[in-house]
Amino acid sequence: MEYTTLGDTGMTVSRICLGCMSFGSSDWREWVLDEEESRPIIERAIDLGINFFDTANVYSDGESERVLGNVLADYDRDEQVVATKVYHRMDEDDPNSSGLSRKTIDQELEASLDRLGMETIDLYQTHRWDYDTPIEETLRALYDAVRREKVRYIGTSSQWAHQFADALYASDRLGLERFVSMQNHYNLVYREEEREMLPLCAKEGVGVVPWSPLARGYLTRPHDEFLETVRGEYMDDSWAADRIDIYRANGGTEINGRVEELAAEHGVTMAQIALAWVLHKDVVDAPIVGTTSIDHLEDAVEALEIDLSDSDLEYLEEPYEPVAINGHE
């Protein structure tokens, strides 16, 4: 396993972050694994040297946090970097169970700690931008969480670059904790973050932890085969349909074909080529890889060993055309 520090912090993380959205309960999404099925994957990740785990309170309505916490309880907590997120509605009857107000952050942080069975969260991230709460209120609540030793670092996810710049400026102006990481939507078939967000992160020393580096599985197998998978069928009539549509549009299908071609040339899987491309980006610290299979997890780790040439990178990138901004909702 390769390791790096997260942004300008001194915290060391594995270059592969295990995404835990697929662990929890199939009552939430049909492709999600329960604890018994999830445990071997998380344990294998630790065996492979992964020390960075990302979840969110909303994943499986909290069950993902509980599953992750139960498995990690069998290991040395100090050796793991645990990240979770807050923003989305957790209780239909409680309007304060969503957003980024002080009240929401305080109560949802305690709920996450309880489900994880931990005293401190290493990286507590805001899941989306809250248009109803001043960023200063959010930052003060997060600052207080760090002072109370409930949280070590704060991060954020999926927003406009001007919003992120506002947040960083507010932290500096008020002497509050700064966001140290950006979890954003970035892969070979969705590169809009290269325009403003990634240069901003590089300039400000913010760690980049991309979600969906394999385009929700679209870059793991040929286009037509993907549409026949459970997730491919699921996307056609779901909340994620707009995302797979943008992957297929404006050069995406051709990029999928080129990933398949290079995978054959290198004697590796399509997923490994797509992930190697993300890992070759200097601004990226650790892509978040979600999986329901130990084999696929091992494939992801092996992608660290793939050396793509400049011509390979150019060949993969050349068909890309701009698409609408996606993932900020």
Predicted regions and their residues:
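N-terminal binding-site loop/beta-alpha segment at the start of enzyme catalytic domains
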Residues: 1-80
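Active-site beta-loop-alpha junctions enriched in small/polar residues
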Residues: 21, 56-58, 85-89, 126-129, ...
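Beta/alpha (TIM)-barrel catalytic core signal, keyed to glycine-rich beta->alpha loops juxtaposed to Asp/Glu
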Residues: 133-318
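Structural motif corresponding to the early beta-alpha repeats
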Residues: 75-99
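Active-site mouth loops of central-metabolism enzymes
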Residues: 23-36, 92-103, 127-132
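Active-site groove signature of glycoside hydrolases
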Residues: 113-132
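Short, acidic/polar
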Residues: 32-45, 100-116, 164-169
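Acidic (Asp/Glu)-rich catalytic clusters
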Residues: 8, 47, 69-81, 113-117, ...
